Every structure is written in structure tokens, then in C-alpha cells.
């Protein structure tokens, strides 16, 4: 467990902004840049339930590829991405380029980065990528928790280890959602009945989670962007 990723998460929990209306079953965590984490809506008991990270695991693949030199920048088109670079591939959560990168990295190397990231709960199973890179794009055999997802976003926001190196800084450029009214960096995930959006702006980090089908993804985006008082321009 990486202590740096859990800064601020063990403070006093509180429910904030009770006037907001959110779908039943949605949990939102929010951490001001210099403050403590709040449960905006949902149940604190959900914090440590093991769940599939879905496409939020693509940030680990991206970070690994940047650190290993497989990807040099966020705009150069990736193999399998139909002309899109790393940033747009992350935002659109396109599977093929990340499956290809995962295969080039290999399960052992990618597993090491997964551990370093602090995102994954427990040990990385042996042979976890036996089905190939496509499995890695969703990390179906790995588990995370709401606490870990949010810890990662807080560490991004605060620029702490392990995201403070050159590759981690490039990843922050890749996480930018272009064309929005406020500058936000985030990643979505929707797979195996788990819907995620985790990231940060200049003032706070936010993680939104809900169980449900992919068709409810717009609700996740609406809740995430709504924490900054804006609506997402993309569905």
C-alpha cells in the first residue's frame, strides 16, 4: 500500500451538499486540494468493496507505456486508434490501442506498474493477462476499491508519488478533457456493471461510482462535471 496515495483519506468524513439530487446507489467522494475527503452522496461502507476498475485501468497502461518509451507524447496517433493520440484514446476509452500497448508491455511489467499505482487491491494474479491485451484494457481479473480510485485522483491533483515523474506528468496532459468549460483531468470506466469517473480540477479531486449498465454512463459524467457547476459537452 502506498501511503502517499492515501493522504487526506483517513480524516473526518462528512456528507456535503445535501441539496444536490443524485441517482440512488451513486457514491461520490470529493477532496479539496488542501482539505479532507468528503462523502458527497452514498454510503461510506462502499469505500473498501472490491470492484472491477473497468477502463480506469487504462491510465495504468498509458502511464506504463509513457514510462517505458512506447508512447512519446499525448497527440501522436497510436496503433489501433484510428488516427487518435493517447489523450483522445483515453477520453473516448478506445480498447484496441490499449490492448496493443498491454501486449507489448507484457503481464509482468504491467503488473508491476499496477502495484506501483496503488489502484489495484491485493496481489496481481499469476497469468492475469493470459487472455491477452484485450483483457488488460478492462483489467477484468483485477480489483480496485472506491478508496483506491479516489486516492489515485488525489495523488494526481497533488502531484505526489508515483505520479510525480516525467511519465506521470505526461499522463496528466493525456487526462485533459478538451473543449469543456473548466479544465478537468479525468478517466471514465464502464465494464462488468461498474461505472466510474475519477479525476480532478484546480481545486479538488472527485470520484463518482455507480453500479449499472453502460447506458447510464451519462449520469456519471453529469455528476462529475456537476461538482464544478457545469455540464459535460460530450456524452
Feature-to-residue mapping (PLM):
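Mid-domain, small-residue-enriched loop/turn segments at the edges of structured enzyme/sensor domains
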Residues: 86, 100-153
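Short glycine/serine- and small hydrophobic-enriched flexible loop segments
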Residues: 63-71, 100-103, 151-158
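Bacterial N-terminal signal peptides
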Residues: 4-14
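Short, well-structured active-site flanking segments
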Residues: 66-83, 163-168
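Structured C-terminal helix/loop/strand segments within mature extracytoplasmic catalytic/sensor domains
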Residues: 21, 46, 50, 103-109, ...
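Second-shell loop/turn segments in exported
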Residues: 44-52, 76-88, 95-104, 133-141, ...
Amino acid at each position: 500500500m502506498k501511503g502517499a496515495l492515501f493522504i487526506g483519506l483517513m480524516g473526518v468524513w462528512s456528507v456535503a451538499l445535501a441539496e444536490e439530487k443524485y441517482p440512488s446507489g451513486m457514491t461520490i467522494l470529493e477532496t479539496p486540494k488542501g482539505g479532507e475527503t468528503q462523502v458527497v452522496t452514498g454510503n461510506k461502507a462502499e469505500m473498501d468493496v472490491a470492484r472491477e476498475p473497468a477502463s480506469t485501468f487504462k491510465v495504468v497502461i498509458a502511464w506504463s507505456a509513457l514510462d517505458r518509451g512506447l508512447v512519446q507524447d499525448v497527440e501522436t496517433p497510436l496503433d489501433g486508434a484510428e488516427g487518435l493520440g493517447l489523450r483522445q484514446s483515453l477520453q473516448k476509452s478506445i480498447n484496441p490501442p490499449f490492448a496493443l500497448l498491454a501486449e507489448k508491455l507484457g503481464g509482468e511489467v504491467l503488473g508491476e506498474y499496477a502495484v506501483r499505482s496503488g489502484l489495484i487491491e491485493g496481489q496481481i494474479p499469476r497469468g492475469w493477462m493470459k487472455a491477452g491485451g484485450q483483457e488488460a484494457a478492462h483489467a477484468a481479473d483485477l480489483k480496485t476499491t472506491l478508496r483506491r480510485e479516489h486516492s489515485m485522483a488525489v495523488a494526481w491533483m497533488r502531484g505526489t508519488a508515483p505520479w510525480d515523474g516525467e511519465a506521470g506528468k505526461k499522463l496528466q496532459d493525456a487526462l485533459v478533457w478538451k473543449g469543456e468549460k473548466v479544465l478537468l483531468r479525468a478517466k471514465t470506466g464502464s465494464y462488468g456493471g461498474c461505472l466510474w469517473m475519477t479525476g480532478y480540477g484546480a481545486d479538488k479531486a472527485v470520484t463518482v461510482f455507480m453500479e449499472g449498465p453502460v447506458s447510464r454512463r451519462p449520469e456519471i459524467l453529469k455528476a462529475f462535471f456537476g461538482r464544478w457547476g457545469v455540464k459535460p459537452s460530450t456524452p
